[in-house]
Amino acid sequence: MQNDQQRFSLQNRTVLAHPYKRLGGAFTVKSPSVPNFHDKMHSDHSSSDSALVNGSFRANDHRSVEPSCLGQASPSEHDGNLSVIDLYGDEVESQRAEGEDDDDNNGDNGNEDLEEVHSDDLDLVPDDDNRQRVELEGAASATSANSNGINNTHFDRYGFKKQNNYISEAEYDKWWVEYSQYCVRRKHKWQLLLEKSGLPVTDDSPSRFPSKSERLKRYVRKGIPAEWRGNAWWHFARGQEKLNKNKGVYSQLLRKMKQIKKQNPNEKQVQDLDIIERDLNRTFPDNIHFQSSLHNKEGPPIIKSLRRVLVAFSLYNPKIGYCQSMNFLAGLLLLFLDEERAFWMLVIITSRYLPGVHNINLEGVNIDQGVLMLCVKEYIPEVWSYIKPSIDHHQKNNKTFSPSNKKVLFNMQKNEFLYRLPPITLCTASWFMSCFVGVVPIETTLRIWDCLFYEESHFLFKVSLAVLKLSEHDLSKIKPRNNSLNYSWGSNLNQRGGSMGQEDSDMEIFQVIQTFPKTLLNPNEIFEKIIFKRRFNLNRLDQDEIDRCRKFVAAQRLKFKTYGELLGNSTSEADLPINDNTDNKGIHITSDAVNEALSSEVYGFKKSLAGVHWNNSIKEKVKQMRKKKDKGD
């Protein structure tokens, strides 16, 4: 066979493919963007585990999978032990129409209205000498998978089902035809970027990436090649730095797990072990790699790894232990990283990117929801107008304040939504706890993770605002009930009627916010319509702003809780009776004291003044101005 050609069989068809030149007819190839699965699990694994893991190859591995390694499966069963290469039929049409323009405006971005166009970032069609060598892989492994009862056409390149309640398989396939070509072009640009940076790609698995820059951020936002994601996430999150400081820790945790099991096999020694076991089979049940076989009661290798990672984390950080949603974080990490690195990435996510979010009291997630509501109010007031009526309604019907305390009531209501969170946060809280896993389709989730690890946690707030902004059209379709979206407190609506009307509206808003993100199949929709648009103020949001805002919200919530307890109502945060001369257990607090405490802080977002980030107190700023004036005199 000639060196410049490859021959492979596609369902009894023999195809000759030139690696450089465009073919005259359509041909089927594997997408070059398949996850770079690890070659092995942790070194402490049993030999049986290792044998099963041999089915997980790298994207450029041409070895076939022996049926004996895969086990026997019934025609209706999906074997979770197969690798991604073996399972998917994410086959793409590599041929494009002659003369098709392939730059950012018509290719990557697909939107001529984009405000950021960079000449060094255009997806130009490479000539024969510089053309990306698209790896043409045979369908032998796919045929082997089919013989074991797996229909590849129903699953995406990560092993997830294409179809769900909001997206049909036909819609997915239609989108994938174009998006797969986008992935090919973006990977080629990444390769050129690394080569220009003196970081040549070897074995299609780069472990080093360029220093942070605006250009690299743009590349990350347009998507990291899927088979590079594990290494890229690890690099940007400084995972190796964390591992170097904790060498041998994960192995020690695994040995501790074994010792506990040997000493007390029937006694629960590990925190939340029962909950972890229960959630293992609830983790990505529709994903091929997580599905159990009738002949393997212990579950597929990735489930065993997931168990070890979650139990090890519970031992490593007993203050958090195990929190539901962590199984999805660890599960997705295991699709792209080996077991030990997945463990440390979970540690990094819970400590650096989402501090306190997974703590037992979940105060961290409440703080972040307060921050998100502040951001919605500031950056997308048009969406805030749908949330505010619920807050106003609650304040209007709150009978715990006496008429003599109107000033106290007014000052508390200014920041009330920070500690009495709006109903919508029951939905958006899961966005943060799971980092959008299960909230948006998998390709969009992975794009968000790319940006999260590169840009830090503020991107979660930014993309949340973008999703809410995109949902505005659906929110506008909600019909006001009893004038609930535009409350007029001078109306003659009775309390019950107004309450029911607002509750109905809250429910409809909740449904929109819960279901709309699940339709965002194309991640570029978020980026092209919102993130890359300079005219949206939400794109000014940065990590410094989020860090400051978190401190502000945490202080406000703590202050409210403290005064609630002092006033003898610590059992119910929702009702805080404040009356003049309240005497509780010898503590004498006047409404003026409460008013001073709860109204002293006001948050201000960065505007055009770079030196003014936020205001702790209007009075404090006045004092500072007076001091400066006195010094000047």
Curated annotation (Swiss-Prot):
Alphabetical UniProt keywords: Cytoplasm, GTPase activation, Phosphoprotein
Highest taxon of source: Eukaryota
Residue ranges with Basic and acidic residues bias: 37-47
Record has Phosphoprotein as a keyword: yes
Any GO BP: formin-nucleated actin cable assembly
Region Disordered, residue ranges: 26-127
Name of one Pfam family that matches: RabGAP-TBC
Compositionally biased tracts (Acidic residues): 99-115
GO molecular function: GTPase activator activity
Cellular component, GO, one term: fungal-type vacuole membrane
Major location (coarse): cytoplasm
SMART domains: TBC
Further comment: Present with 178 molecules/cell in log phase SD medium.
Protein known as: GTPase-activating protein GYP3
Organism: Saccharomyces cerevisiae (strain ATCC 204508 / S288c)
Gene: MSB3
